[in-house]
Curated annotation (Swiss-Prot):
Biological process, per Gene Ontology: cell redox homeostasis; response to oxidative stress
EC numbers: 1.11.1.28
Active site: C131 (proton donor), C134 (cysteine sulfenic acid (-soh) intermediate)
Enzyme class: oxidoreductase
Recorded family membership: Belongs to the AhpD family.
UniProt keyword Oxidoreductase present: yes
Enzymatic reactions: N(6)-[(R)-dihydrolipoyl]-L-lysyl-[lipoyl-carrier protein] + a hydroperoxide = N(6)-[(R)-lipoyl]-L-lysyl-[lipoyl-carrier protein] + an alcohol + H2O
Record GO terms (molecular function): alkyl hydroperoxide reductase activity; disulfide oxidoreductase activity; hydroperoxide reductase activity; peroxiredoxin activity
Protein task: Antioxidant protein with alkyl hydroperoxidase activity. Required for the reduction of the AhpC active site cysteine residues and for the regeneration of the AhpC enzyme activity.
Top-level taxon: Bacteria
Native source organism of the sequence: Bradyrhizobium sp. (strain BTAi1 / ATCC BAA-1182)
Protein name: Alkyl hydroperoxide reductase AhpD
Disulfide bond annotation, renumbered to this chain: C131-C134
Gene: ahpD
Length: 181
């Protein structure tokens, strides 16, 4: 499925979402690997199979097998880490912050692609999943690696757009009879 075909599934009440998707698709401010890895990782984070299939198909033409796998890995690891570290952050009992996580996450240290790209994908997924601790950690690593604030903002903007595409498509699938006027 192409971006155009995905746009056709977005209902008229979400015209702004369609326009944002078009803008995202034509944005060239990130490297192709960073951009299309974001498409994959963020689409997976939406848990919407239509969006995931479409954006993975688009990205496959621009990513190596290793980069495609790394983007999927970022989404999977953040699904775990975002739940755990959001709990640690939000729990009133701060004892949990002193306990070892005991979660395997070796791929973060050796993702098989440029570390900054993997961190960018992880940051964007963490934004979708709402983990402030993870957002701060990934943003700090990205800044230390010399990634600009504009690139970081672009990644989070892509995450917001991809999430809104998933929600718009899901909302269009729900039909409720309207009360007679």
């Amino acid at each position: 499925m192409s971006i155009e075909q995905l746009k056709e599934q977005i209902p008229d009440f979400a015209k702004d979402v369609r326009l944002n998707l078009s803008s995202m698709a034509s944005d060239e401010s990130l490297s192709p690997q960073a951009k299309y890895g974001l498409f994959v990782a963020c689409a997976i984070a939406t848990r919407n199979p239509t969006v995931t299939a479409a954006l993975e198909a688009v990205a496959a033409a621009h990513l190596s097998a290793a980069a495609l796998t790394a983007a999927k890995t970022a989404a999977a690891l953040m699904a775990m880490n975002n739940v755990y570290y959001r709990f640690v952050h939000l729990a009133t009992n701060k004892e949990y912050a002193t306990m070892p996580a005991r979660l395997r996450m070796n791929a973060i240290a050796n993702p098989g692609v440029d570390k900054a790209d993997f961190e960018l994908w992880s940051l964007a997924v963490s934004a979708i999943n709402g983990c402030g601790t993870c957002i701060d950690a990934h943003e700090r690593v990205l800044k230390e690696a010399g990634v600009s604030a504009a690139s970081i903002q672009t990644a989070v903007r892509f995450a917001a757009i991809i999430q809104s595409v998933a929600v718009a498509i899901e909302a269009a699938a729900v039909t409720v009879p309207l009360a007679a006027e």
